[in-house]
Amino acid sequence: MDVLRPQIVTFDGRNYRKNPIQEKQYQHEEDEDFYPDSMEYSDEPCGAYEVAQTPHGFRATVSAPSLLYKHIVGKRGDTKKKIEVETKTSINIPKHGHEGEIVITGQHRNGVVSARTRIDVLLDTFRRRQPFTHFLSFFLNEVEVQERFLMFQEEVLRKCSKDRGVDSTIFQNPKKLHLTIGMLVLLSEQEIQQTCEILQRCKEEFINDISGGRPLEVEMAGIEYMNDDPAMVDVLYAKVHMKDGSNRLQELVDRVLERFQSLGLIVKEWTSVKLHATVMNTLLRKDPNAEGRYNLYTADGKYIFKERESFDGRNILKTFENFYFGSLRLNSIHISQRFTVDSFGNYASCGHVDFS
């Protein structure tokens, strides 16, 4: 790691320097014992914490979903005790299954700040290990598009079914066609509500200006593939663009992405959203409920490898290069929940903002 360019971790809009760590591995250890002696953090945040002075010293609070409490406690309470001893503070964590704030108290302000920083870094570390739970999206499942998609599937199977790896199992469910803006880890109802509020602020600050307070008229037309070799395709997608040829949809989704990245809610992997709708995905071959490259973690956040069999997409790309899937009016950004289905067969929406 370059010490002059350390990893920066963002919490609540503030940036912190994260020093390198050395993890020791022990047989049969669980993740909650993650706090080896060799771990060190820069205890002073780059921004200011809200630390209240009390008659007995100083106090700070940390908001965190109950699912992550165990990582602050550690096995037999070792992690919590270690932080308390080294920072000369007392840390009160809500009981398992109860939502609330983690409260840090101590005689010295620096100690409280140090404990708060260590807890924040631990929370960020283990949040990053959680599987994605939700995603920001546009629904692309209007009736015309579903019908045209089924026509595309029928024609592909009629003309290209003899090509290696091409069969009916790798086509997307037409009711679940969508455009993803970014993936989220939301671990409580409070975090879902906060995400709804952020979307609402986006609407007030720039979505209304970009959309003009009206639905965006778009078309799904043309196909493209994700990887470098058209003879070994894993994901084939339909392209999405504005009917009027403008860049408004791209500008809108990029601004939303930037806002969520700046708040630490979406990992900064890209600076721009690739406008696409997946129509064929080889992960679906063995698991109809698979959700693309994001379906790579178990329920407890452990990485897994999914073997996938690619398909030869050369004939499909040549024959259906400009296939027209239909036009749509995009009027809402949804907070979609993974592995769920609503009454229309789409992903369940936990909240949304409308353009009009």
Curated annotation (Swiss-Prot):
Entry GO MF terms: RNA binding
Region (Required for interaction with ASCC3): 1-52
InterPro entries found in the cross-reference section: AKAP7-like_phosphoesterase, ASCC1, KH-I_ASCC1, KH_dom, KH_dom_type_1, KH_dom_type_1_sf
Span of domain KH: 57-119
Reported tissue expression: Expressed in the spinal cord, brain, paraspinal ganglia, thyroid, and submandibular glands.
Superkingdom assignment: Eukaryota
Gene Ontology annotations of biological process type: DNA alkylation repair; regulation of DNA-templated transcription
Swiss-Prot/TrEMBL keywords: DNA damage, DNA repair, Nucleus, Transcription, Transcription regulation
Subcellular locations according to the entry: Nucleus; Nucleus speckle
Transmembrane segment boundaries: none
Subunit and partners: Identified in the ASCC complex that contains ASCC1, ASCC2 and ASCC3. Interacts directly with ASCC3. The ASCC complex interacts with ALKBH3. Part of the ASC-1 complex, that contains TRIP4, ASCC1, ASCC2 and ASCC3. Interacts with CSRP1. Interacts with ZCCHC4.
Name this protein carries in UniProt: Activating signal cointegrator 1 complex subunit 1
Gene behind the chain: Ascc1
